[in-house]
Regions:
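N-terminal hydrophobic/helix-forming segments and targeting peptides
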Residues: 1-183
Length: 183
């Protein structure tokens, strides 16, 4: 058994895998816990808001061909490192952490849907701050451009923008553009 606690993950969409290596990562999402009855569970939106994980990249002497082809298996090469394990750490260390952030006992957790995210703040880059460095620029810049266009236009009728999730996987989810939200 390895002496560290790892988190099993599932990749979503068109992931640029090497971009997630050696970055401080945090965890946010929804935790479902026991409620007043079996038919009324509680929902908690959580965000650790601090670096709690990293996906370490092996040193060059451990992978001599890394510069020739950056091929990473998500289930074996990209498991986020969360903690060092000692004799007192149990296998459910992550459930304990979720229980702590929700202020409940770990046994009350029924389910969770969580996401890792890079904890690096966006910044201006360049001699004249003419560039923006940030994660998810493809989505954020599109939303920003749409919002600015909507704010500065002077339409005679109704103007709106539609922003959907899941375009990376074909928009065919319940909240995607190909869903039944808009006929």
């Amino acid at each position: 058994k390895p002496p560290y606690g790892l988190l099993n993950i599932e990749a979503y969409g068109g992931l640029i895998r090497h971009a997630w290596l050696d970055r401080p990562l945090s965890v946010a999402g929804k935790v479902i816990t026991k409620g007043p009855s079996a038919f009324a569970p509680q929902s908690h939106l959580i965000n650790f808001e601090k670096p709690v994980a990293v996906i370490p990249e092996p040193a060059i002497h451990m992978n001599r061909t890394v510069n020739e082809s950056a091929s990473f298996n998500i289930q074996t090469n990209m498991l986020p490192l969360l903690t060092l394990l000692d004799k007192d750490t149990t296998d459910d260390f992550f459930l304990s952490a979720l229980g702590n952030i929700c202020h409940i006992e770990k046994d009350e957790i029924l389910a969770y849907d969580l996401n890792l995210y890079p904890l690096i703040q966006p910044t201006y880059i360049g001699l004249n701050n003419e560039f923006i460095g940030s994660s998810r620029l493809d989505n954020l810049t599109s939303v920003d451009a749409c919002m600015k266009a909507l704010e500065t236009s002077h339409p005679q009728g109704l103007s709106l923008i539609c922003l959907f999730d899941n375009e990376e996987v074909g928009s065919r989810t319940k909240q995607g553009a190909a869903s039944f939200i808009i006929p």
